[in-house]
Structure formats: structure tokens, C-alpha cells
Design a protein with these regions (language model features):
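Active/binding-pocket-proximal capping segment
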Residues: 183, 189-194, 245-289
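Contiguous, well-ordered alpha-helical segments that form the cores/surfaces of helical PPI scaffolds
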Residues: 126-130, 170, 214-215, 224-234, ...
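Active-site-adjacent structural elements in folded domains
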Residues: 112-115, 124-127, 193-200, 207-219, ...
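Arginine-glycine-rich low-complexity intrinsically disordered regions
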Residues: 366-382
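Hydrophobic/aromatic-rich core segments of domains that either
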Residues: 281-303, 311
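Glycine/tryptophan-enriched, flexible segments
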Residues: 14-201, 310, 314-367, 383-384
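Glycine-rich, charge-decorated loop segments at or immediately adjacent to ligand/cofactor-binding or catalytic sites
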Residues: 3-15
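Conserved structured core elements
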Residues: 93, 122, 133-140, 156-160, ...
Length: 384
């Protein structure tokens, strides 16, 4: 964590931890300080374990890992898509190199606030989440570098916003500590049913629709922004925060499927999988925390964050010739335009998956960008 548990202004069992991020952030920022990173031990300071050589008798390769099939083995990294996402390499050295590049060499951190909603490429966000999730770098180390950058070069909203994201990460750690296994339950941490918590009029339980789930996993829902993000996840193990919010909203709030199926799929696929962030974000995305429900208008999100369709076309080659004005909703193309674009909906690209009747939300969900939806798990909390 960024803040040590003993330093946050809540009880030792965190029972008084707010269930909303903003009250949590306000308290910790006003009353707590991150501890300094622990310096690395000097050479020879720690004794070598007995039989050390035995630990290196077998050095596994990717081929030795227990992937289920050749398809999974073939997408074990992002190297095949260098223009789509950062090719991640594990370990502390790679993690520190990324911190150094993002903060000092490129100074991308100075514009992070403006670029953070990007989806295509390696530098629209810090991309530190996989290394943070695997313990390759500490959030305290990251913040120490950011503050050094602020003192030596520039301090602005962007530099603060990376720290802000790491506070989100802490929030989910302590949120999970407070609620325990409730973050894995269908009814979530609010303790009510779907009908009583997130929706007006008792909308009933989650739907059982294997075809909708399979389409979502495969990136074949007929909703380009959803499909592009799901294909990126399958190919690289990564997805932007913006993408995670949208795909989670579609699964739980449009298709009405059990949100836990999405959380489980992310757990299976994400390079930056973190239990508390993933499940905490998904339960929030589904409206099962008792807080605000953020239902995203997928078409509007596409127009707002991928107006020319560069991201969608990168991951969905079937749509590469579709005019930008139709990229959010290819089904709106007139027949002659579809023929010219070599993309007849229902033939070359799936028709939009038929969704259940629209449901109303009791907490003012909106079709834009409020919560962190799926990436908190899957969106926020990864230190991206």
C-alpha cells in the first residue's frame, strides 16, 4: 500500500472506513503521509539460504507454464502488438526502468491528466499497474520519484493525478479488508439483491445467458468499443481504465449478466490482476456497493474517446474502412456505404447483441464517465 495501515486515520479493523472514495481520500491526505521507501539492502547484508544452487537447477520457460491450450500460449505477452500497448517485461529492473522513463526521461507524467483517458499506445498512462500488482515496484517508490520530479521540474495536476490513482489503489485494499468476502458475493457489499439495491422496481436476479457472455469474452458483441477492448485483453492481458469501465457496464448493466463472471474473466486474463482492485471495481461497476451506479452509453463513449476510430480499427480489422461517423454504431451505415467499407453488419461484423429491456437506475447512473467501473478492477486502483 501507499499508506501503511497503522498510519491511516481509521480504526485498526477499518470498520469505520468510508465506503466512498472521496471521504477516504480527504481523510488520508489530510492526516496521513506515505512512509519513505525502504532502501535496498547492501551487498552481503543478508545471508544466503542453504542449498541456494538447488533453486536454480530448473529454469522454466513460457512453454513450461500450465496454459490450457496453444491459443492461450500464443498470447502470453503483448509483444505482437507493440503499437497497441506497451510490451511488458517482468521484474524489478523493468519496473524501475518504466518509472524512470515515464517520470524523468519522457516527462510524460507532466501531461498525464490530459492523456489518461487514452486507449491506444504505450504512453497515455504510466502502465505501472502490472509491476505494482506483482510487487515489482512499491507505490511508495513511485510517489517518492513523483515528488522528487515535482520539486526539481514541475508540479501540476498531472503529477498529483498519478498519486491520486495510487490512493484509489489503497482505497480498494482497505475496502476489501473491511468487507471481506462480501466483495465476491452476487449481492455485493451493500447486502441487498439486485432488485433492491441498484434498480427501480425490483428488476430481479442476474440473467443466465451463455451466448451473451461468450460474445463479450470473444469481442463479438456488435458494440465496437466493447469488442475492441475485449480483443485487446485477450491478445495482450491489458486494457485501459476507460475500456474497463465500458466493458463492465455493458456486461452487468446492459446485458444484465452476473458481474462476477466478468470479474472472474479479468482475473484470468489481466497482467495487472489485483484481487482487491479487480473485485472491488467490479462490485462497484455492477451497482452492488450501495453507491452511485455508473451506466455508460457505449456509443457516446466511443465518440468522446475514440472519435476517429483509431483504437477500434486497430483491434477490429473488419471495421478498418468504416467511416469515422459510423464507427460507434456500424449498423447505422447505409447499404452502399457498408458495401464500400467491405463491412456488412451481420455478415462481416456481428450485429449488436440483443439486450434485455432497458432498466432504470435508482442512483442517477449516467452515460459518461463518473465511476471507475471495470478497470477500477479492473479500472482504477492499478496505478495506471
Amino acid at each position: 500500500t501507499l499508506y501503511h495501515k497503522d498510519d491511516i486515520p481509521f480504526s485498526s479493523d477499518v470498520s469505520d472506513l468510508p465506503d466512498g472514495f472521496t471521504p477516504f481520500r480527504n481523510k488520508v491526505e489530510n492526516k496521513s503521509e506515505p512512509r519513505e521507501p525502504v532502501p535496498p539492502p547492501s551487498k552481503g547484508a543478508l545471508p544466503m539460504p542453504a542449498n541456494m544452487s538447488d533453486a536454480f537447477a530448473f529454469e522454466p520457460t513460457v512453454a513450461d507454464l500450465p496454459f490450457a491450450n496453444e491459443e492461450e500460449r500464443s498470447v502470453a505477452g503483448a509483444g505482437a502488438h507493440p503499437d497497441g500497448v506497451l510490451p511488458f517485461e517482468g521484474g524489478e529492473s523493468a519496473a524501475l526502468a518504466r518509472v524512470r522513463y515515464y517520470v524523468w526521461e519522457s516527462e510524460k507524467i507532466a501531461t498525464y491528466f490530459e492523456t489518461r483517458n487514452g486507449m491506444l499506445g504505450g504512453d497515455y498512462s504510466s502502465k505501472l499497474a502490472p509491476w505494482l500488482a506483482h510487487g515489482c515496484v512499491s507505490p511508495r517508490t513511485v510517489v517518492a520519484e513523483v515528488r522528487k520530479f515535482e520539486s526539481q521540474r514541475v508540479e501540476n495536476k498531472s503529477t498529483y493525478w498519478l498519486i491520486f490513482e495510487l490512493i484509489w489503489r489503497d482505497f480498494f485494499k482497505f475496502f476489501a479488508l473491511k468487507h471481506g468476502d462480501a466483495i465476491f458475493r452476487s449481492e455485493g457489499t451493500a447486502g441487498g439483491s439486485m432488485g433492491g439495491s441498484g434498480y427501480k422496481g425490483g428488476a430481479g436476479p442476474w440473467r443466465d445467458d451463455p451466448a451473451a457472455l461468450a460474445a463479450w469474452k470473444a469481442g463479438k458483441t456488435g458494440y465496437p468499443l466493447v469488442d475492441a477492448n475485449m480483443r485487446e485483453l485477450a491478445a495482450t492481458g491489458f486494457m485501459s481504465n476507460r475500456g474497463r469501465q465500458n466493458v463492465a457496464s455493458w456486461l452487468a448493466l446492459d446485458a444484465g449478466l452476473d458481474w462476477r463472471l466478468g470479474a472472474e474473466w479479468f482475473e484470468n486474463k489481466l497482467l495487472d490482476y489485483d484481487c482487491s482492485a479487480n473485485w472491488g471495481n467490479w462490485v462497484a461497476a455492477a451497482g452492488m456497493t450501495g453507491g452511485r451506479v455508473n451506466k455508460f452509453n457505449i456509443a457516446k463513449q466511443t465518440k468522446d474517446y475514440d472519435p476517429e476510430g483509431a483504437y477500434v480499427k486497430y483491434w477490429i480489422p473488419e471495421l478498418k474502412d468504416v467511416p469515422a461517423k459510423f464507427i460507434a454504431e456500424p449498423r447505422q451505415m447505409p447499404g452502399d456505404v457498408a458495401q464500400k467499407a467491405h463491412c456488412v453488419v451481420g455478415v462481416d461484423y456481428p450485429a449488436p447483441f440483443k439486450l434485455p429491456p432497458r432498466r432504470e437506475f435508482s442512483s442517477g447512473g449516467r452515460g459518461g464517465g463518473g465511476g471507475r467501473g471495470g478497470g477500477r478492477g479492473g479500472g482504477r486502483g492499478g496505478g495506471r
